[in-house]
């Protein structure tokens, strides 16, 4: 049986990072997302600069203001967060259909079928983080391991903008020295019960019998017993059927030079064709999307009689669609190429890996 390879991606201070990306004046400042300082709400996310003052998620805004009176208090913009999250989830699904989103800013990916001797899980995680950075200008942290519990644990160990791999060589040492409050799923109430029963770290938890833990925590006790041993058999649950494959890029500065834009269209067509090839799919629709410098989103789609899967075919159609969309007087900040109406390909484009 092939050993599983699971990645857990967790965006860094997601809401605050989106706000700083969309308003560069906030970069490097103590940003607190949730509402006005005088509001009765709670903190959704705080930047790392704000966390230095003791501000954290779920804290009352009034308390956050007392701790960080010079902070930049921002009202949540869920439209922007959802749009960015959709971009990120699309990146995940360009690698695998086995994606389990846990929230707007985190997900598990089962990439077992993608791993090869020359393409370890850690390298795939690096590619995913690179794609997120290039397409959204946001950083993400990743955890890589052989089950979901350890992957999630790993993703929080080297934040922000970091990656940690937990495998059979280091799992025991990591778990034994881990503070009990750092175990995923152990909240304040559970932590207090653990402390009251002499459990302060992973080793203390490991030394408890399964019976003792069930007595203390009921059914959860069996899960805690397994976690202390790095055991988790839960699957990455994905009910989504892939309907499209696509890639988009945000330019560093607004662009209205056709040559530069079409170079990017060629690049995106190639990446899209590569992903279709991995899935052994072809497509009967091609869509080009642009976002103008004024953040207006425009798109145009073409339905095809015969399906396409090659870089050249996708580019030729995308070229026509872009020419229909473009306005020489309006610079753009983003362009995307997506193919849809997927069907099983009768011909698999060959890559170098097919000959190895």
From Swiss-Prot:
UniProt xrefs under SUPFAM superfamilies: DNA/RNA polymerases (SSF56672), Lesion bypass DNA polymerase (Y-family), little finger domain (SSF100879)
Gene3D superfamilies assigned: 3.30.70.270, 3.40.1170.60, 5' to 3' exonuclease, C-terminal subdomain, DNA polymerase, Y-family, little finger domain
Transmembrane stretches, start-end: none
Cellular compartments per GO CC: cytosol
Superkingdom of origin: Bacteria
Location within or outside the cell: Cytoplasm
Keyword list, A-Z: Cytoplasm, DNA damage, DNA repair, DNA replication, DNA-binding, DNA-directed DNA polymerase, Magnesium, Metal-binding, Mutator protein, Nucleotidyltransferase, Transferase
Residues flagged as site, Substrate discrimination: 15
Cofactor annotation remark: Binds 2 magnesium ions per subunit.
Keyword DNA-binding carried by entry: yes
Residues annotated as the enzyme's active site: 106
Residue ranges annotated for the UmuC domain, each copy included: 6-187
Cofactor: Mg(2+)
Binding-site positions, Mg(2+): 10, 105
Protein's GO biological process: DNA-templated DNA replication; error-prone translesion synthesis; SOS response
Catalytic activity line of the entry: DNA(n) + a 2'-deoxyribonucleoside 5'-triphosphate = DNA(n+1) + diphosphate
EC assignment: 2.7.7.7
Listed GO MF terms: damaged DNA binding; DNA-directed DNA polymerase activity; magnesium ion binding
Quaternary structure, from the entry: Monomer.
Protein's job: Poorly processive, error-prone DNA polymerase involved in untargeted mutagenesis. Copies undamaged DNA at stalled replication forks, which arise in vivo from mismatched or misaligned primer ends. These misaligned primers can be extended by PolIV. Exhibits no 3'-5' exonuclease (proofreading) activity. May be involved in translesional synthesis, in conjunction with the beta clamp from PolIII.
Stated family: Belongs to the DNA polymerase type-Y family.
Protein name in the entry: DNA polymerase IV
Native species: Staphylococcus aureus (strain MRSA252)
GN (gene name): dinB
């Amino acid at each position: 049986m092939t050993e599983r390879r699971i990645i857990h991606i967790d965006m860094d201070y997601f809401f605050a990072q989106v706000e700083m990306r969309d308003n560069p004046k906030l970069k490097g400042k103590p940003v607190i997302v949730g509402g006005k300082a005088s509001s009765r709400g709670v903190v959704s996310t705080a930047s790392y600069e704000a966390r230095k003052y003791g501000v954290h998620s779920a804290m009352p805004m009034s308390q956050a203001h007392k701790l960080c009176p010079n902070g930049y208090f921002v009202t949540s913009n869920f439209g922007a967060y959802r749009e960015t999250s959709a971009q990120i989830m699309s990146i995940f699904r360009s690698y695998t259909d086995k994606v389990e989103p846990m929230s707007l800013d985190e997900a598990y990916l089962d990439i077992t079928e993608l791993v090869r001797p020359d393409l370890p899980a850690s390298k795939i995680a690096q590619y995913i983080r690179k794609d997120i950075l290039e397409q959204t200008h946001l950083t993400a942290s990743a955890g890589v391991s052989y089950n979901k519990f350890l992957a999630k644990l790993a993703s929080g160990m080297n934040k922000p903008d970091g990656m940690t791999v937990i495998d059979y060589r280091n799992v025991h040492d990591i778990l034994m020295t881990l503070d009990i409050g750092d175990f995923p799923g152990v909240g304040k109430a559970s932590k207090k019960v653990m402390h009251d029963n002499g459990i302060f770290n992973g080793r203390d938890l490991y030394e408890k019998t399964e019976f003792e833990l069930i007595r203390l925590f009921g059914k959860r006790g069996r899960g805690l017993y397994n976690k202390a041993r790095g055991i988790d058999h839960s699957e990455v649950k994905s009910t989504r059927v892939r309907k499209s494959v696509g890639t988009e890029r945000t330019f560093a500065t607004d662009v209205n030079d056709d040559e530069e834009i079409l170079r990017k269209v060629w690049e995106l067509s190639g990446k899209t064709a590569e992903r279709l090839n991995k899935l052994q799919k072809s497509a009967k629709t091609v869509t080009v999307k642009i976002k103008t410098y004024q953040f207006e989103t425009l798109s145009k789609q073409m339905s095809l009689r015969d399906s396409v899967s090659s870089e050249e075919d996708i580019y030729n159609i995308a070229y026509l669609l872009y020419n229909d969309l473009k306005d020489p007087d309006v610079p753009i900040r983003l362009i995307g190429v997506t193919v849809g109406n997927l069907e099983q390909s009768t011909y698999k484009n060959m890559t170098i890996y097919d000959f190895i």
